[in-house]
């Protein structure tokens, strides 16, 4: 365990003058992860499993007098969420608390502690997308979130742009066409609605141009911008500051069992004193897992 912070570590604060002390706590943006991941309550178990089912193909014609055809559904794959505990703590000596009371040092570091837990959640959520093209991070179906070969009954489907490209009018339109041609686990056409762009900070202005320009971006023609005129991506762009690729981008759809944060135990804050030293210990923990079930929730490209 790390040693408690002592008054000697904060000499400029506890000496008998009122210092102007910058507490190091910055304002933070609203939660970014919640724009992309839906929080759900986890079940009271060590892990949570979601079976992904497949149904039936198209119904065949039945000539007069012929018996009806039977088909079987089943489980295509299982997605398992394993709950993990995340936490951090700090300790303060009683002397430091007493002599540093003009900046309420316990409250200051409690805010730092809260920001550390928020940062963990943001990093874990962003890393689901940072590893979306990496075969070392498979989903329940055995391939990454973004893949050209998601297995389904009698074939595969792709949620990756056929030709890797940076964010542009053309690449965005091609991805939206791909979403329009989405199929279910039996290969039947389905209705997926593209909800929003997901981009790194370097693409925020390009995303704004593509989503809000009345005319087609990047050329001198007087063509309308079909993304805007049709009313696609009506939730705009979600910008995640912790995305590591400056060129990758994604389109999130309304697939119902998509990007999830399953909360097993919400944030718990505890404080206790040490009888022998009079130090105070502060701890915060929470337990959850973040990931995805249906990869149709995201279509993407790593860019070039």
Could you describe each region identified by the protein language model?
Residues 2-12, 146-185, 191-196, 202-304:
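Sequence/fold signature of self-assembling virion shell proteins
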Residues 103-108, 115-178:
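Alpha-helical scaffold segments that mediate packing/assembly in large oligomeric complexes
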